[in-house]
Curated annotation (Swiss-Prot):
GO cellular component entries: viral envelope
Keyword field contains Metal-binding: no
GO biological process terms on file: viral budding via host ESCRT complex
Localisation: Virion
Alphabetical list of InterPro entries matching this protein: Matrix_C, Matrix_N, Matrix_Paramyxo_C, Matrix_Paramyxo_N
Domain notes: Late-budding domains (L domains) are short sequence motifs essential for viral particle budding. They recruit proteins of the host ESCRT machinery (Endosomal Sorting Complex Required for Transport) or ESCRT-associated proteins. The matrix protein contains one L domain: a FPIV motif.
Gene3D superfamilies according to UniProt: Viral matrix protein, C-terminal domain (2.70.20.60), Viral matrix protein, N-terminal domain (2.70.20.50)
Keywords noted in UniProt: Host-virus interaction, Viral budding, Viral budding via the host ESCRT complexes, Viral envelope protein, Viral matrix protein, Viral release from host cell, Virion
Record-linked Pfam families: Matrix_Paramyxo_C, Matrix_Paramyxo_N
Motif (FPIV motif): 23-26
Keyword field contains Plastid: no
Family per similarity comment: Belongs to the morbillivirus/respirovirus/rubulavirus M protein family.
Name by which UniProt lists this protein: Matrix protein
């Protein structure tokens, strides 16, 4: 590839699907002269993306990990309320339930869960959440049904370095994010598909820029880029493959590639499905090479933590909205990427109002 062009995707920044709003911090009295952050919920509806009679509610919880008691003490007073030390904020995705009940009651049920946690390790540092008790309305959630969830600590804990390897740890839910989405729309691309490469292939990448509302004095700005209009983050996502040759064995021109990409009629949005995520919707026809990257209804979900854990954790607490989206065509192998120019394609949609709402519980 000896040239570089861009396919910029159109989006409506005013639409709710282009924004992710943060929870506002609201303090309430505890009755003993102290204050605590009031539990909150938020609801985002993405059921307009696809015509569907069956919607699911994806539940993402945000809360705090506490150490209960002091395991090193050998003498002490027996107390009904042992000391609880705040260690770090954390996120736990519970899974989904059918959208058949009261969403506010569903959020309230999450607050009553009893969850413990501990560290573990495989090839990465893990955090294992154990569900001790959960209301009946949550029993169909994958994590509740399995009684546990083992997750990458860096992606799910704000400050994993603060979590000890022993002692009694408790995860307390404080914020509940509910996303209503057509049942078949949430499709997480298999890792094996994302690793496919070949010299006869082109990789399609999505370069997503997200505006982040943040106080200039916040330490979070150290992880963000700055423009005249504020701060933003960059993400790079692998969204598909295309062949370099046609059925006759002739090399496919960039003009033909751009035409195929535009015919996909792509839309992009922000949501909180598997944590803060970029959602992609292809309304046009998909080739056999592109099929594994989308659900049967043409959707794909990209958890931001997989691309950039740091950016994902910033979005736990800050309002964000889509700034720009570009499709970039790259060579099909990493070696070829290193020695060839990228090709950018301009055009497609950013879904209106995909915003991550004002949460802000987790200032580190």
């Amino acid at each position: 590839m000896d040239s570089s062009r861009t396919i910029g995707l159109y989006f409506d920044s005013a639409h709710s699907s282009s924004n992710l709003l943060a929870f506002p911090i609201v303090l309430q009295d505890t009755g003993d002269g102290k204050k605590q952050i009031a539990p909150q919920y938020r609801i985002q509806r993405l059921d307009l993306w696809t015509d569907s009679k069956e919607d699911s509610v994806f539940i993402t919880t945000y809360g705090f990990i506490f150490q209960v008691g002091n395991e090193e003490a050998t003498v002490g007073i027996i107390d009904d309320k042992p000391k609880r030390e705040l260690l770090s904020a954390a996120m736990l995705c519970l899974g989904s339930v059918p959208n058949t009940g009261d969403l506010i009651e569903l959020a309230r049920a999450c607050l009553t869960m009893m969850v413990t946690c501990k560290k573990s390790a495989t090839n990465t540092e893990r955090m294992v959440f154990s569900v001790v008790q959960a209301p009946q309305v949550l029993q169909s959630c994958r994590v509740v049904a399995n009684k546990y969830s083992s997750v990458n600590a860096v992606k799910h804990v704000k400050a994993p370095e603060k979590i000890p390897g022993s002692g009694t740890l408790e995860y307390k839910v404080n914020f509940v994010s509910l996303t209503v989405v057509p049942k078949k729309d949430v499709y997480k691309i298999p890792a094996a598909v994302l690793k496919i490469s070949g010299s006869s292939l082109y990789n399609l990448a999505l370069n997503v820029t997200i505006n982040v509302e943040v106080d200039p004095r916040s330490p979070l700005v150290k992880s963000l880029s700055k423009s005249d209009s504020g701060y933003y983050a960059n993400l790079f996502l692998h969204i598909g493959l295309m062949t370099t040759v046609d059925r006759k064995g002739k090399k496919v021109t960039f003009d033909k590639l751009e035409k195929k990409i535009r015919s996909l009629d792509l839309s992009v949005g922000l949501s909180d499905v598997l944590g803060p995520s970029v959602l992609v919707k292809a309304r046009g026809a998909r080739t056999k090479l592109l099929a594994p990257f989308f659900s049967s209804s043409g959707t794909a979900c990209y958890p931001i933590a997989n691309a950039s854990p740091q950016v994902a954790k910033i979005l736990w607490s800050q309002t964000a909205c889509l700034r720009s989206v570009k499709i970039i065509i790259q060579a099909g192998t990493q070696r070829a990427v290193a020695v060839t120019a990228d090709h950018e394609v301009t055009s497609t949609k950013l879904e209106k109002g995909h915003t991550l709402a004002k949460y802000n519980p987790f200032k580190k």
